[in-house]
């Protein structure tokens, strides 16, 4: 796979010098050669004489010729709706900066016959570029197939979990390639040994495998942010470095979660066409704003390059981060919590037994680790595009709720449980909840959000009676006990 510079040089070398007028009026020239009638021939000559080849016409001819020659050589050029240019290098599409493309098109113009000073004129260079934005326009819409791109093959993951191998195609619109070859017989015994040491719970390993598998295809809807939690010397850093190389360093970014969620959007544009944004050391508070939820859900999000207009980005990295403890947030809603995929790295590695070169040794097993990730992707699809259940992770989620959600804290403190036979007015329960929050310096939810959260915790809330008041199906899990020291009255 050649570099962009090498490919552009090759395309340039195959462009012929042309007479722009002959190319533009090709049909008239052909007719003139075959015409026998002198009067008609004279009319054709007069017509050709009056044709003026403007800069606009030359711009069209340059853009169309570049597209034609690139295609014949097995390459491709396209510009999308955001005016971002890409070059197909026979394996994947790589971005070309606007300035590099302008210089290339200027060289093409000169190669095709323009004099040096005309070709280098800024006005004309800009005109050719604007024409290229039209002639090379391609929205590059991906199909719905689940595919993975490597150096030597493209893999198609079928609905039944089987894997098919295909040759590379520009029409797949891959903007990445894993930096190694596919080997269906590869193994990774050292990686499995590492996983069993740092994540002995098999249910957790399975979910982690499925998440990494989903990172291999950005079009999969997952709506999860990986949160690897644990204090030092527990394998998080080795896992981070290994995933960095499995997915390819060029395909992974490491921007701080909160910088991705700010209003400016400069960091967000940098995760466009990446497979994963893995922040290796995040310890703090996640901004509770809508941008985090958008990013976690893979929804279109506004981003911008410095000094440029904002654009809507659709294909961007999944999010992951390592942290010593579960992060806090001003948003304690279910919608926020459900997007966090908490993986507990709670096994301490004995410093005397730790291998400082383990991450380097695991590089030799990348094709095998890829097969591990593909197995996770296949299981995710067989699950109906859902992560496998994990009692360990569910327990972590419940603990997180009890530590961050005032409604869940209240229910736990009062030993309340859902019970369709027990009834309590929502108004009374909410008043009791507010008193609990005041006593514990917590910000209470309003009555509507309180009701919604109760329903989220599987409490039945319905309007009953003649006044249609909301009633909650709730009871106390610890029955009251009469003290043996008090005589009944």
Model-flagged regions — what are they?
Residues 1-82, 110-489:
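Feature primarily recognizes SF3-like P-loop helicase cores of small DNA viruses
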Residues 83-88, 92-106:
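Trp- and S/T/G-rich repeat-edge/linker motifs of beta-rich repeat architectures
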């Amino acid at each position: 796979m050649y570099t962009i510079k090498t490919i552009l040089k090759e395309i340039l070398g195959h462009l012929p010098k042309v007479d722009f007028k002959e190319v533009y009026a090709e049909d008239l020239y052909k007719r003139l050669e075959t015409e026998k009638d002198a009067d008609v021939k004279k009319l054709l000559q007069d017509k050709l004489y009056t044709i003026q080849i403007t800069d606009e016409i030359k711009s069209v001819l340059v853009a169309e010729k570049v597209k034609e020659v690139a295609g014949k050589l097995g390459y491709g050029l396209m510009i999308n709706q955001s005016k971002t240019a890409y070059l197909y290098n026979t394996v994947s599409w790589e971005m070309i900066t606007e300035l590099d493309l302008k210089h290339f098109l200027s060289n093409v113009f000169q190669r095709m016959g323009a004099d040096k000073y005309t070709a280098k004129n800024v006005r004309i260079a800009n005109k050719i570029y604007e024409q290229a934005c039209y002639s090379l326009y391609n929205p590059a819409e991906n199909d719905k197939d689940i595919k993975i791109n490597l150096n030597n093959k493209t893999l198609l993951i079928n609905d039944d979990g089987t894997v098919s191998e295909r040759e590379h195609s520009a029409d797949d619109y891959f903007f990445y390639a894993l930096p190694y070859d596919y080997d269906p017989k590869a193994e990774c015994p050292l990686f499995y040994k590492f996983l069993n040491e740092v994540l002995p719970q098999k249910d957790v390993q399975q979910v982690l495998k499925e998440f990494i598998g989903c990172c291999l295809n950005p079009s999969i809807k997952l709506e999860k942010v990986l949160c690897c939690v644990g204090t030092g010397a527990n394998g998080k850093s080795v896992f981070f470095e290994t995933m960095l190389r499995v997915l390819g360093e060029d395909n992974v970014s490491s921007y701080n979660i909160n910088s991705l969620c700010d209003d400016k959007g400069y960091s967000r544009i940098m995760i466009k066409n990446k497979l994963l944004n893995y922040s290796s050391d995040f310890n703090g508070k996640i901004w509770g704003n809508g941008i985090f939820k958008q990013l976690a859900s893979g929804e279109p999000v506004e981003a911008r390059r410095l000094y440029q207009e904002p654009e809507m980005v659709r294909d961007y990295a999944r999010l992951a981060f390592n942290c010593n403890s579960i992060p806090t947030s001003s948003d304690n809603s279910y919608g926020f919590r459900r997007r966090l995929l908490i993986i507990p790295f709670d096994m301490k590695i004995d410093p005397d037994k730790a291998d400082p070169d383990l991450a380097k040794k695991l590089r030799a097993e990348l094709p095998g680790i890829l097969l591990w990730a593909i197995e996770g992707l296949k299981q995710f699809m067989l699950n109906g595009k859902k992560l496998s259940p994990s009692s360990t992770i569910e327990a972590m989620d419940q603990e997180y709720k009890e530590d961050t959600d005032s409604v869940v804290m209240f229910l736990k403190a009062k030993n309340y449980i859902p019970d369709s036979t027990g009834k309590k007015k929502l108004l009374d329960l909410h008043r009791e909840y507010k008193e609990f929050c005041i006593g514990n310096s917590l910000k209470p939810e309003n009555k509507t959000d309180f009701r919604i959260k109760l329903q989220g915790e599987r409490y039945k809330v319905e309007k009953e009676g003649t006044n249609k008041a909301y009633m909650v199906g709730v009871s106390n899990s610890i029955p009251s006990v009469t003290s043996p020291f008090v005589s009944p009255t």
